[in-house]
Curated annotation (Swiss-Prot):
InterPro entries: dCTP_deaminase, dUTPase-like_sf, dUTPase_trimeric. It comes from the Viruses. It is an enzyme of class 3 (hydrolase). Its EC number is 3.6.1.23. This is Probable deoxyuridine 5'-triphosphate nucleotidohydrolase. This enzyme is involved in nucleotide metabolism: it produces dUMP, the immediate precursor of thymidine nucleotides and it decreases the intracellular concentration of dUTP so that uracil cannot be incorporated into DNA. It does probably not deaminate dCTP. It catalyses: dUTP + H2O = dUMP + diphosphate + H(+). It comes from Sulfolobus islandicus rod-shaped virus 1.
Length: 158
């Protein structure tokens, strides 16, 4: 079942869903918009974090971004990450991304550049999370290697 804005507010008030910081205006009809954090990593041979208020995503470039918000999902909620249409209309892409029940942390999202340079600003709403409730709480909530991550987190070996 997809959560409505009312459901999302109920989950937030009961602490079953935590989004910090949370702006009331980011709670949408059927999801929550998340903002770009202030870190980026360009995926190339020498991957270094860049910290700033603005970033240019160059044509066909692959980057990792982080969300400004730290989230925590209870063991009966998952989230689907979608790029807001404003950015998709500029030609940017993200791969299908699911946030598992029990996840806690800032999200690291891969973004693929357009055919033209695109400027991103820290604090811009760029992701739309759609929350869904599982029929029953999961037996084994997420407790993987990216649990409680902060900032852009590079791939970790298994």
């Amino acid at each position: 079942m997809i959560l409505s804005d009312r459901d999302i507010k109920t989950y937030i008030n009961s602490k079953k869903l935590v989004i910090n910081p949370l702006s009331e205006d980011t709670i949408r009809e059927n999801g929550v918009d998340l903002k770009i954090g202030n870190e980026i990593v360009r995926i190339k041979e020498n991957m270094e974090k860049e910290v700033g208020d603005e970033f240019i995503i160059y044509p066909n470039e692959h980057v990792l971004l982080t969300t400004k918000e730290y989230i925590k999902l209870s063991n009966d909620i998952i989230a689907f990450c979608n790029l807001r249409s404003t950015f998709a209309r500029k030609g940017l892409l993200i791969p299908p991304t699911i946030v598992d029940a029990g996840f806690e942390g800032q999200l690291t999202i891969e973004l693929v550049g357009s055919s033209i340079p695109v400027k991103l600003k820290s604090g811009e709403r760029f992701l739309h999370l759609i929350f869904a409730r599982t029929l029953t709480p999961v037996e084994k909530p997420y407790n993987g290697k990216y649990q409680k991550q902060k900032g852009v987190t590079l791939a970790k070996e298994d």
